[in-house]
A protein has these predicted regions:
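Arginine residue identity/basic-tract feature
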Residues: 54, 58, 88, 110, ...
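Intrinsically disordered, low-complexity acidic/Ser/Thr-rich segments used as protein-protein interaction/activation
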Residues: 107-115
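Secondary-shell segments that build the walls of catalytic and ion/ligand-binding clefts
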Residues: 1-49, 114-242
Length: 242
């Protein structure tokens, strides 16, 4: 569903209005220095939030649009895989910028989520490894470089700073193999960051579990985490806030 349609359909919803206002705030307070890859476009703000990405062509704003689609797809359909998409999107766009600036010419989008864990932690991966060629060895080096950046250290502080993180994401006790994205996040945030044993496992999606999360303002928490992460990402890419 297009994000502008979501806002239209749910314009009276307080959570939707809250997120829309956050997008407006982001547009009004963020800027990026001109670079060879991404030149500033000072075009006027358009009412259609869905056009924001096309107007500015800024990777982090793209993340924000993707995040908004994810949250409100989750909100309207009760699909609870949004955390995976948030982190995957954040990683992919950051890596695309990194690759572009390094002029490596690598098609990063060929990498799917499970590749990340294989490249980051070859020995411990629970997935079947692919045949590595020179391009994937290059991916490995660049991804290792990517996750060592200050942005991810700050993100780690954000998501682990509140007690609600463990309150909401420590429910699944089943011994299941983690997904690639989960392995990636574990490599970045530490082995005690047990996402797979929580929201990313489809087996946790019982009616009672979902109802509990709705009652406990799950979406407000998700929005708060996503907003703080993206603010830090904006600063990292030379955006500034008043």
């Amino acid at each position: 569903m297009e994000i502008e349609q979501i806002f239209k359909d749910y314009e009276q919803d307080e959570i939707v209005k809250k997120f829309y206002n956050q997008l407006v705030y982001l547009k009004n307070h963020a800027f990026i220095l001109d670079t060879t890859e991404y030149k500033s476009n000072k075009g006027e703000w358009e009412e259609s939030v869905g056009k924001l990405m096309r107007i500015y062509m800024r990777p982090i704003l793209t993340i924000y649009i993707d995040l908004s689609n994810t949250i409100y797809y989750c909100y309207t359909s009760q699909n609870f895989h949004s955390l995976e998409v948030i982190f995957r999107t954040l990683m992919e766009h950051h890596a695309q910028v990194l690759f572009t600036k390094n002029k490596k010419g690598i098609d990063f989008l060929k990498l799917q989520g499970w590749y990340y864990s294989n490249l980051l932690d070859e020995k411990k991966s629970t997935e079947k490894l692919v045949q590595y060629d020179d391009s994937y060895k290059e991916h490995y080096k660049l991804i290792k470089q990517m996750i060592s950046k200050p942005l991810y250290k700050k993100v780690k502080e954000i998501v682990k700073s509140g007690s609600y993180w463990y309150q909401y994401f420590n429910y699944n006790e089943k011994n299941e193999k983690p997904s690639g994205v989960t392995n990636l996040v574990s490599n970045i945030f530490g082995k005690d960051f047990k996402i797979m044993y929580t929201t990313l496992s489809r087996s946790t999606h019982s009616v009672d579990f979902n109802a509990y999360r709705r009652e406990e303002n799950y979406y407000d928490i998700l929005l708060s985490i996503g907003t703080e992460i993206l603010k830090e990402a904006l600063k990292y890419f030379r955006y500034e806030f008043d």
